């Protein structure tokens, strides 16, 4: 076991103290079927010595029964937990694993590569800071590679590590790696991700995963784990204060506090705040936590605020700074991932739940549907399981939100079926209908007609319909 594991076994309090101040990175592994996602995670855990002896013994036993490789020890079984996954050698569920290095703590989400499990991937990626896109060196950039990359971009992941896996299968050929790197960079011009890094690896053999590879001395960069340890994610934090009230704490007549997790920004005792939707203002009297009162609190902290004035605040309300208010609207546009077998019904009433706030609402129109394999937009009058589309929403009570690209915590929501209480969709807000209408490009009648003429007579030019941009 590693030093951390030894410390965990001998002095739990010291282990917790050491790890308390480490920053946390959540990352997702995704790629085509059988690209080696589970094997990669198994290799990270194995080579960083984060596996206990009893777990090792169980995996060695299971390897004899389910082994999908030629090795005596199947690393993918460290992650593939479902019986059907082990029998088929694939990942179906979203599997989470936890480990830590001297620099940082990690939560890994291993997601399915199959298209029919797109909703599982969306679930796993929704809270991640970084994505590892695995590409099989034998096949290069595939359709599923594009699909997973697009979904990561859609969900606001700002850091990508493209791991070209199974380099051992192509004799560690540098030319193969360079071609895949060039192909992906060309494709990635369509993505809204600025930080993309590349590393050639062999998860099965351990090359460039935790330790540097002796077989790829031509690669000048860092192994995968070193990249994960050094990529800076703290710059992604939004500095506008947002606190969604989860409940009002009233243990006695002398105390009234508003509990929730700080979604973004920072708050201090004495700061002026505004409650939404009432618009009432007050000042922070105290910030109470499990460890006692604090002078300030920041994103990610679970706190209870007490105020100097008695103002009306209840569950589902939002506390902000008066000069940094979010958008408030009953009409908004959002990218919607449909997550159930029954198709989306336009104008049907669903429960719209954003944080702790719930209201009734419906999709009043579908702007377009996105082919996640090609990223092309097309017309649609419904969305079915695993499809993604841009939709116009109308809700009964105004939502207080930021654009998802600016704040993932306050720009996301889920849709719940009123009859079954099942979660049927997940949405990422693009903005209010009014705001987006102001920024939409306006084309003259001549431009629209000319565009239609070009598309009709010169289809090989692949000109896009400007009315749908």
Curated annotation (Swiss-Prot):
Involved pathway(s): Sulfur metabolism; hydrogen sulfide biosynthesis; sulfite from sulfate: step 1/3
Catalytic activity of the protein: sulfate + ATP + H(+) = adenosine 5'-phosphosulfate + diphosphate
Domain tr-type G: 22-224
Region (G5): 202-204
One Pfam family it belongs to: GTP_EFTU
GO biological process: hydrogen sulfide biosynthetic process; sulfate assimilation
Keywords, ordered alphabetically: ATP-binding, GTP-binding, Nucleotide-binding, Nucleotidyltransferase, Transferase
PROSITE patterns, A to Z: G_TR_1 (PS00301), G_TR_2 (PS51722)
Binding positions for GTP per the UniProt entry: 31-38, 110-114, 165-168
Region named G1: 31-38
GO molecular function, one term: GTP binding
Complex and partners: Heterodimer composed of CysD, the smaller subunit, and CysN.
NCBIfam families: CysN, PRK05124.1, PRK05506.1, small_GTP
Annotated protein name in UniProt: Sulfate adenylyltransferase subunit 1
Species the sequence originates in: Psychromonas ingrahamii (strain DSM 17664 / CCUG 51855 / 37)
